Amino acid sequence: MFDDIWRQFRKQRLGLIGGGILCMLLLVALLAPVLAPYDPLAQDLYKRLQPPSIDHWFGTDDFGRDILSRIVYGSRISLRIGLIAISLALTGGTLFGLVAGYRGGMVDMLIMRLMDLMLAFPSILLAIAIVAVIGPGIENAILAVSIVLVPQFARLVRSSVLTVREATYVEAARALGATESRLLFYSILPNCTAPLIVQTTLGMGTAILDAAGLSFLGMGAQPPVPEWGAMLSGGRELLLRAPWVMTFPGLAIFTVVLGLNLFGDGLRDALDPKTT
């Protein structure tokens, strides 16, 4: 099975490019202390707002901090935010979807109407509202982003459960006395694995983008943390004088989100039964 999936995935050139971008992000995050030429928090007011040069490839910001070093260390923060947020969303959405699809009736209606209500708002607006209630900070931003991504997973899992809950093998397991939890997690959930993998990859891009948006608005990571969205926020008043302060963090966000989307699309096509 995995050989078939890998064979199909290798045909997805854009998916391979996306995978390469993700591998590069992972390596940069892991090797940040080695790759970063300077301390990301070190200030040198004598070198403030220097354009890209041999000494500072991406230039310096208004505190004289090396932008390349801050972007390199920022990859760790963005990766952590994306992984934690998508893991929480995956767990919560899967549980809601399993219960809604298996129980049906009033339980299904209540859960799905709640999901529909959340989906009625753009994810970033809902995340802003949540952070406005619980307060700013990276941890609260992660929680807010994970909450707004729950409906995507819940609807996906519910639709898969509705497809297989009356399948012969599920009925056989039920007849043999399998408990409800065993039916859900051992008989039904494995059939949701492929679409969940794809949604997790695509959702992680949304998580990183929304978290960067919160930091840009001052509701996520707080200075002097080298988070890409916070770096964008710090450079918005310098756009005309020192455009590199915003340009390189913006390119970092764009590249990572693009890589996740390309990789997710490649996985989706590789896992499509019509191609495998």
Spell out what each predicted region is.
Residues R76, M118, P122, V131-G135, ...:
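Residue-level hotspots within pore-lining transmembrane alpha-helices
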Residues I77-I81, F96, D108-M112, E139-L143, ...:
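Short alpha-helical transmembrane interface motifs in multi-pass membrane proteins
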Residues M1-T94, L98-V99, G105-M106, L110, ...:
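Gly/Trp-centered helix-boundary motif
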Residues K11, S69-I81, A85, D116-L119, ...:
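Alpha-helical transmembrane segments of multi-pass membrane proteins
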Residues W57, T91-G92, G101-Y102, V107-T163, ...:
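Generic hydrophobic transmembrane alpha-helix motif, especially the helices
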Residues T60-R65, Y102-R103, L162, A172-R182, ...:
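Short helix-to-coil transition segments within interhelical loops
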Residues L31-L35, V99-R103, A129, V133-I134, ...:
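Helix-loop junctions at the membrane-solvent interface of multi-pass transporters
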Residues I130-V133, V145, S160-V161, D210-A252:
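Glycine-rich helix-loop "coupling/hinge" segments at transmembrane-helix boundaries
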